[in-house]
Amino acid sequence: FSVKQKDKIKNLAEKYEYQVVTFRLIGDLEVLFKRSQKRDLDPKRHLSHLVSRYHKGDVLEDRSKADCLVTYDIFMDRCKNRGYGTFELGHLIEVDVTDFSKIDYPALIKELCDLVEE
């Protein structure tokens, strides 16, 4: 999320009295861009994420021809200038997702469970 959604989320949390936890996913932007590219070019990704106009049943065999693929410059601009790295509401848990194998999942689950039990 970014600051654009913060007030809406905060108001919903207050209205429905729920506890907010922000998971901020950080990482090497070069690695994250390559991961994003791979995901976008995967035929299993729904085409509507990649094109400016989509109608049910549309097919695009060569995903690299999609007109809304996120370029390197757009990706970097979004990551650096939309406030994703500073968004925080409630308790913050920051996770480096550069290498999934290095994430201590049990520790994350414990931290979240401990918060819920408070």
Label each region the model flagged.
Residues 35, 53, 78, 111, ...:
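Residues that form generic nucleotide/phosphate-binding pockets
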Residues 102, 106-109, 114-118:
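C-terminal alpha-helical "lid" subdomain
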Residues 42-106:
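Small-molecule kinase domains that catalyze NTP-dependent phosphoryl transfer to phosphate-bearing small molecules
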